[in-house]
Amino acid sequence: MNELVGAINGVIWSPALIFLCLGVGLYFSLRSRFLQLRHIKHMITLMFQGRPTDAGVSSFQALTMTLAGRVGTGNIAGVATAITFGGPGALFWMWMVAFLGASLAFVESTLGQVYKEKINGEYRGGPAFYIEKGLGVKWYAWLFAVVTIFSCGLLMPGVQANSIGASLEIAFGLDPNVTAALLAVLLSFIIFGGVKRIASFSSMVVPFMALGYIIVACVIIAINITELPGVILLIWKSAFGFEAGFGAILGQAIMWGVKRGVYSNEAAQGTGPHASSAAAVSHPVKQGLVQAFSVYIDTLFVCSATGFMLLITGLYNVQGVDGAALYTGIAGVAAGPGYVQTAMESMMPGFGNYFVAIALFFFAFTTIIAYYYIAETNIAYINRKIHRPWLTFLLKLCLMASTVYGTVRTADLAWGLGDIGVGMMAWLNIIAIVLLHKKAFVSLKDYETQNAQGLDPQFDPVRLGIKNADYWLGERKDEPAANPGQTTSVVREQSAGKLNN
């Protein structure tokens, strides 16, 4: 089984996908004049604007729902495996994926908002919606929907569950079978409650767990601050093959950095737009910018915290393509959460081991919940045409079964299946956003023009020449106005003009 999964991964995660992720991210960055740098301050402001409505959630709730998917086991176990198979330089390439991927996240999340719909009283959107409405290729949209349901419902939850089981067993000696049963019960309570319960749970848990983890990591880094310059130099030299010990795995550093970067921050994967489309906003670009910043939170903050902890303490291993040990800093511990637990425990005895296990539990559990929401959204897309309500119930059963199975299986198999799911979605989504990116950048220019005039930007797809954005033409009735009394028609009249930014 492991050999088959590995062979499939070798095809999906070929160099073509690696360079496509980096190349398209670079092109979008240049095309937008590096919006991920120009609008950082504005991104932070937008995170706290807006409020939930009967059909949608606030910008902050949408952000936390997206972070629930982005911030998961990839931020802990994923970083450990990236360093193991790609060396310290893999962390640099994770940073590159985050920086360039922010532009990808902007494009896909903006498109998700442009083409979203209201289904059964809730906002739904994502690649399947913008592929059908923007490209007019229904079979491609259905293909993405089916692949996403399969990936998020069956292939990817096992990675998160496996890391939860491994970390709890290391810290508390809890049998993985008990953990599997516990996860199934907790999941059933959340996923049978609908999108509002998912948003409420995520907005309460995600900010605190991420902030707490970063603070503890920063304390460890501060204690070892004299080691930081050397670690940064090691990362830099390893990233480009200048470090003698890791020069032979330069290609592995790039591959594992990109693979784990995409797995962690989800940029270009097509999962982020599902949650961002649920936000009630006056202009799609607002969520596009918020989601671009969420990539930074995931990788530049949380993943970096993990990477620095491992490299500063020296408690990690690196192996070559042939499996030969290139560096051994920790013996008898499999690549994954055990590295991070050992590193933190070495600096904070009696605390670190348990803290990582608890943090990872919340990271991974909220990610599984996010996977459910993503898969459910694609079922909602399919049900617009065939109307099979039982598909949602079947998804819930499959998700819980996948979680239980992943908890008790080997880590290699769990990660392999997860990588297949991520890779399939990335291929399909990147092709779509390359073909549709002009609509996102037309929307960006419109937003920047209105914002420069001191207006609260309002979206008018007709004026911008964007077709099939049906929600914005007549269904947008319960959105909260940021500036009461400022009508859409006035904004439309005033928003024509040159981009002034």
Q: Where do the protein language model's features map onto the residues?
A:
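N-terminal alpha-helical transmembrane segments of multi-pass membrane transport
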Residues: M1-T73, I83-G89, V434-N501
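Extracellular loop-to-transmembrane helix junctions
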Residues: G6-H42, L46, A82-E122, D298-A305, ...
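Membrane-interface loop-to-helix entry segments
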Residues: L20-I44, N162-L168, L174-W236, E376, ...
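Helix-loop-helix module between adjacent transmembrane segments
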Residues: V24-S29, V97-G121, P127-I191, A359-I369, ...
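Extracellular/periplasmic helix-exit of transmembrane alpha-helices
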Residues: S29, F106-Y115, N120, C218-L234, ...
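Transmembrane helix-loop junctions in multi-pass membrane proteins
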Residues: R31-Q36, G74-V79, P88, L154-G165, ...
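Flexible loop linkers connecting adjacent transmembrane helices
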Residues: F34-S59, T81-I83, G87-L91, W95, ...
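Alpha-helical membrane segments and immediately flanking helix-loop junctions
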Residues: T53-F85, L111-V114, I119-A128, E132, ...
